[in-house]
Amino acid sequence: MIIYTTEVEDINSFYTLESLKEVYGIIWMLVPILTLVLGITIGVLVIVWLEREISAGIQQRIGPEYAGPLGILQALADGTKLLFKENILPSRGNTRLFSIGPAIAVISILLSFSVIPFSSRLILADLNIGIFLWIAISSIAPVGLLMSGYGSNNKYSFLGGLRAAAQSISYEIPLTLCVLSISLLSNSSSTVDIVEAQSKYGFWGWNLWRQPIGFIVFLISSLAECERLPFDLPEAEEELVAGYQTEYSGIKFGLFYVASYLNLLLSSLFVTVLYLGGWNISIPYVFAPELFEINKINGIIGTTIGIFITLAKTYLFLFISIATRWTLPRLRMDQLLNLGWKFLLPISLGNLLLTTSFQLLSL
């Protein structure tokens, strides 16, 4: 069998073309992931700056002003400083659990961002079980906190880890029941379908008006999941020094610091998606999505508008969360557990039964 030179060149060019296609596919798969990571990083920096400015305004202070214009680079400067701090390990603690705990807390939160739709086109994973995947993944974070508290071999750290686990379990159930009510209303567990179900009547189509009780319960539960005041018992300075973070320093302490703000950003995004209409402009008959489906340029414009609307609603909720920190006093541990088990759980269960009844009657 004789193979001519031209045939060999054709075979080589074919394999080269196939390898280029594989490389292009890998790069195209990494682009949205890297874009999401970059956006999350910028979002966390903005939240830290906003919290410092709003807190300074409430307390009548100046706030950060030297690190960049208006102090916008202060969070970046703090993060850079933590990178070069010494990484101290407890001599009698479990170093494996001590090191793995912060990573579990951060990774579980980062994975949850994959089901957040920033616009009709921009979502990393549009799954049929999107919101329940978020609940399942977010349930892993308290395990990391408990591991950190136990591995530190410190009574304050261990008590902080136990408090974090108890608080998360107490408020995870009402949160799940509220999400289940939204899923019943939208006839879907996909985050994209939930947003589209709210787009028919603009502002009045939001689940906020159809689920006011669920919205309030979700709001309180999400604040408790983020361990924000008045629910910051796992790291109460007056009682536990810094809770499960007491023995940490350097980059590991920075991971916990970032995880708290990532969780706050994630909760705010889910409030926007589940109750505030997501990327929809929410003015009926003014914004027609079909206008932005004509060509690629219009599609990019529509995606940009959707991202802007989603972030605007998200940062509105963030402002409420930050203002709440300086408004309400911290609860006692028994008050926190009673609020979760004796108040929010029955209300969320009743809300779910009402939603189910209305859905059955409407069939």
Swiss-Prot record:
Keyword Thylakoid applies: yes
Membrane topology term: Multi-pass membrane protein
HAMAP family: NDH1_NuoH
Family the UniProt entry places it in: Belongs to the complex I subunit 1 family.
Gene (name only): ndhA
Its biological purpose: NDH shuttles electrons from NAD(P)H:plastoquinone, via FMN and iron-sulfur (Fe-S) centers, to quinones in the photosynthetic chain and possibly in a chloroplast respiratory chain. The immediate electron acceptor for the enzyme in this species is believed to be plastoquinone. Couples the redox reaction to proton translocation, and thus conserves the redox energy in a proton gradient.
Top-level taxon of origin: Eukaryota
Annotated Gene Ontology cellular component terms: chloroplast thylakoid membrane
Compartments in which it is found: Plastid, Chloroplast thylakoid membrane
PROSITE patterns assigned: COMPLEX1_ND1_1, COMPLEX1_ND1_2
GO biological process: aerobic respiration; photosynthesis, light reaction
Enzyme Commission code(s) on record: 7.1.1.-
Keywords: Chloroplast, Membrane, NAD, NADP, Plastid, Plastoquinone, Quinone, Thylakoid, Translocase, Transmembrane, Transmembrane helix
Organism: Gossypium hirsutum (Upland cotton)
Name this protein carries in UniProt: NAD(P)H-quinone oxidoreductase subunit 1, chloroplastic
Chain segments annotated as transmembrane: 30-50, 98-118, 129-149, 248-268, 300-320, 343-363
Reaction(s) this enzyme catalyzes, per UniProt: a plastoquinone + NADH + (n+1) H(+)(in) = a plastoquinol + NAD(+) + n H(+)(out); a plastoquinone + NADPH + (n+1) H(+)(in) = a plastoquinol + NADP(+) + n H(+)(out)
Record's subunit section: NDH is composed of at least 16 different subunits, 5 of which are encoded in the nucleus.
GO molecular function term, any single one: oxidoreductase activity, acting on NAD(P)H, quinone or similar compound as acceptor
